[in-house]
Design a protein with these regions (language model features):
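ATP-dependent adenylation/nucleotidyltransferase module used to activate substrates
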Residues: 1-137, 148, 157, 164
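AMP-forming adenylation/ATP pyrophosphatase catalytic core
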Residues: 104-111, 115-336
């Protein structure tokens, strides 16, 4: 961006203190090491740099929602909430407060304006192996108009080569894979430390409601899970559902995981202002899934029904369903 003639400023968000979350032994995203790396790159580029403290907002809008979704029986995607409420909301406010027009990040996606409708479009990255459009579906028209993704048309090896040629300290830094505030993957342990709660054992039940074993707390299990159940039932069984009030986890054969229909709420439309009737598009209900043909229909109260042409495995409450028309994101919402 600096080479293109823009007036640039570097900024990184402090979203939590590792020690506060019991993660002092990990180098997570937004860690002290990340702040140091960002500051060094800004110094090399000869641009101003600030660390912005959003710890309280992050706790309220991301961490506490993450916990509430698990406690309600869903499986959250906190990266989507962080993008929606932190990176492209708080940081845009920060940019404007400093007289700057855009937030620029390293996400793999593209933004273009539709010359016919004037709407800002979110599109898949050209380097599809790294495409992140799924976790960016919640961006508003205002946010898209003031955001740039310069890496959206590039591939990862080329980007690393440029970073090495510039001598950036983070040129060979590993990609982040885990939830930033739960880097060890033990989200239940994190939740218990954070809330002071203990999530009690309960019953595994089959599809007919018969008790078939004991589980270690319903929050530990997600739809479609097979590993770690500790059940010997003569055939493989999978998590098919949870009743959080009764603290039961329903298990059954893999065939019970397949369904064609879901309902989603909290929808954000991007390429269209609203859904006014049935539309045949492609949709995916998890990050690593390939989009599948489906029909979407508007329901009352802003809800949306998605009916896939073919049954899909383990559609999970709390995850996002994102709709595509080719490489353009039509919109997305949270599975109910």
């Amino acid at each position: 961006m600096k080479q293109a003639g823009y007036r640039c400023m570097g900024a990184t968000m402090r979203l939590y203190q590792n020690e506060d979350l019991g993660q002092s032994g990990f180098h997570t995203c937004c860690s002290a090491k990340d702040v140091e790396d960002a500051a060094e790159v800004a110094f090399q580029l000869d641009i101003p740099f600030e660390v912005v403290n959003y710890t309280e907002d992050f706790r309220e809008k991301v961490i506490e929602k993450f916990i509430a979704t698990y406690e309600a029986g869903g499986t959250p995607n906190p990266c989507i909430d962080c993008n929606r409420t932190m990176k492209f909301d708080k940081m845009l406010d920060f940019a404007r407060a400093h007289g700057l027009d855009h937030v620029v990040t390293g996400h793999y996606a593209r933004i273009e304006q539709d010359p016919e409708t004037g709407r800002w479009l979110l599109k898949k990255a050209l380097y599809t192996d790294k495409d992140q459009s799924y976790v960016l579906y919640a961006l508003t028209q205002d946010q898209l108009a003031h955001t740039k993704f310069p890496l959206g048309g590039m591939d990862k090896p080329s980007i690393r080569k440029i970073a090495e040629e510039q001598g950036f300290c983070n040129a060979r830094k590993h990609d982040s894979q885990d939830i930033c505030f739960v880097p060890d993957g033990d989200y239940v342990g994190f939740m218990e430390r954070y809330t002071g709660k203990y999530y009690p054992d309960g019953d595994f039940v089959d599809l007919d409601g018969r008790v078939v074993g004991r589980h270690r707390g319903a929050v530990r299990y997600t739809c479609g899970q097979r590993k770690g159940l500790g059940l010997a039932m003569g055939a493989p069984v999978y998590v098919c559902g949870k009743d959080m009030e009764k603290n039961t986890v329903t298990v059954g054969p893999e065939s019970a995981l397949f369904t064609t229909t879901l309902v989603a709420g909290d929808f954000n439309w991007i390429s269209i202002p609203a859904l006014t009737g049935p539309m045949h598009i492609k949709a995916k209900a998890r990050y690593r899934q390939t989009e599948q043909p489906a029909t979407v229909r508007p329901l009352d109260n802003g809800l949306v029904q998605v009916v896939f042409d073919e049954p899909q495995r383990a559609i999970t409450r709390g995850q996002a369903v994102v709709l595509y028309d080719g490489d353009v994101v039509v919109g997305g919402g949270t599975i109910l």
